[in-house]
Amino acid sequence: IQSMPILERTALQMATGRILDVGAGSGCHALALQEMGKNVCAIDISPLSVEVMKQRGVNDPRLINLFDETFSETFDTILMLMNGSGIIGRLNNMPEFFQRMKRILHPGGCIFMDSSDLRYLFEEEDGSIVIDLAGDYYGEIDFQMQYKDVKGDTFDWLYVDFQTLSLYAVSYTHLTLPTN
């Protein structure tokens, strides 16, 4: 856990109750939570990731999509770390995402999500930022994984800036944001 970034370590320490690790990958966060004595369910859509989690000793790894309606358990903490916002795919999926969170998150529960703001990619030498406001949201990316000659299918991935995420969170939940 000490080799993890401070944001991840803090989220793991703050996670309480029944914890859902979304997009768990190899299970590094789930294993750290288990070592801390916490109850964690780790989900991923990759059969290989779930197999790796099993081999590494994750207690409750599952092959399931967060948006699969048959997955109806509830949790006190939902972790979406390491650019976990990506699974939302597109900005127009935010309402569906927050509706889903309302169904699986216990009242008073927490979602810990991180994302990179890609605005820096559009920064000019003078410090100004040039973004095509008529185009798609600048954090919507078409991803494709490749290893040597093997290419996967393309998929949508969302990097969302803090302000945009906050606006959606307030619009679709009962959250209030602190004022400065």
Task: Please report, for each region that a protein language model flagged, where it lies by residue.
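Conserved small/polar residues in nucleotide/adenosyl-binding loops
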Residues: 173-180
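A short SAM/SAH-binding and catalytic strip from SAM-dependent methyltransferases
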Residues: 76-94
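A short acidic, Gly/Pro-enriched loop at the edge of an enzyme's catalytic core
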Residues: 69-77
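Conserved SAM-binding strand-loop segment of SAM-dependent methyltransferases
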Residues: 57-68
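A short glycine-rich, Lys/Arg-flanked "PGG" loop and its adjoining helix->strand segment in the class I
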Residues: 95-107
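Conserved alpha-helix/loop element of class I SAM-dependent methyltransferases that forms part
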Residues: 2-18
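Conserved SAM/SAH-binding beta-strand->alpha-helix loop
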Residues: 46
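SAM-dependent methyltransferase
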Residues: 107-164
